[in-house]
Amino acid sequence: ILVWGTEAQKQAFLPPIYRGEVRTWQLLTEPGAGSDLAGVTTAAIRDGDEYVITGQKIFVGSDHGADRIWMIACTKPGGPRHENLSWFMLDASLPGITVQPMELMGTGGEGGTDPVQKNTVFFDQVRVPAFALIGGENQGWKAASTHLELEHGAGGRIGRNRVWDRLLRYAEPYWEVLLIH
């Protein structure tokens, strides 16, 4: 959002995240696509001022739930890979979104095991305002690449520092609020 969002999207989405008022989940992985992010099949089809999202994502989040979801979806089914994807930030409570827990074995303390909860998230004709589209239709590969670069640290320190500097400049008006709370 910081890099690819419009100013209106930054104003709507970022302050509540900075203030810790909302919990977010990223939804990338799909059954059958695994780590092939360009192979997602969850569809987001434009219908007037909305997108209708249908599909599912797996290995999502934790048992704490989410208020907002950022996700990649296919907005041009059958289109060229990497040129048919779009990035969205949407309200997790929209009608048609169902979260189903997946109990998985994870690593616990002292090398033991603990159950680790992830979720499957289903989208059944979820209507999302076009405002939720980040970075432009069919430009999701760029947004996802930027997101993963920041998350995983690929692309080198210079790129991360530049984005971090932008983040700090953007958050500066909220520092007092952040420090008080």
Question: How should these model regions be labeled?
Answer:
Residues 2, 72, 181:
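A cross-family signal for key residues in well-ordered alpha-helices
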Residues 168-181:
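Membrane-integrated ABC transporters
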Residues 9-166:
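FAD-binding core of flavoproteins
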